[in-house]
């Protein structure tokens, strides 16, 4: 069966469901999301919920997809989302760029990325840039991280 995964965060009983600024409990201001808590798909059994990593089981070309909700309250609300391979951001900045200008602004952020990876590599989703009072909310099934082997 072709390697594929899809994880999300239910977050029942735990309000740490965002990364960035914005007040309240946050996983971190920037960095990788390590607290996904639910799997919908994991055909190779290679996603580790304890650290938010998908360990590449077979070398090949992979498609990665991730989503969350950008929330902005005030200030210079710039947020970038990205993927990380073996702990490093896949680019010099994020794959997406969001900037708020309306109080209580919310919109969906979706990122995609295609890359050849070797067996044993690991991938994560995260936020390399979060300024002012904004965050990427991924709890309550409003965000997800997924991927699959193209070939």
Regions found by a protein language model. Give the residues of each.
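Beta-strand signatures of extracellular beta-sandwich domains
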Residues: 80-84, 124
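Glycine-rich strand-loop-strand elements at beta-sheet edges
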Residues: 85, 89-119
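Terminal (often C-terminal
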Residues: 1-76, 89, 99, 133-151
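Extracellular beta-strand-rich recognition modules
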Residues: 60-70, 108-112, 121-128
């Amino acid at each position: 069966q072709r390697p594929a995964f899809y994880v999300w965060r239910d977050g029942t009983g735990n309000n740490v469901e965002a990364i960035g600024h914005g007040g309240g409990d946050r996983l971190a201001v920037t960095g990788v999301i390590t607290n996904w808590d639910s799997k919908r798909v994991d055909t190779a059994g290679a996603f580790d919920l304890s650290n938010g990593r998908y360990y590449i089981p077979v070398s090949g070309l992979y498609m990665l997809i991730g989503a969350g909700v950008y929330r902005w309250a005030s200030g210079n609300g710039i947020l970038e989302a990205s993927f990380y391979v073996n702990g490093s951001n896949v680019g010099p900045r994020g794959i997406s760029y969001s900037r708020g200008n309306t109080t209580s602004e919310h919109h969906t952020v979706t990122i995609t990325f295609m890359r050849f990876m070797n067996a044993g590599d690991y991938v994560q989703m995260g936020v390399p840039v979060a300024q002012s009072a904004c965050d990427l909310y991924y709890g309550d099934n409003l965000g997800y991280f997924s991927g699959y082997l193209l070939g």
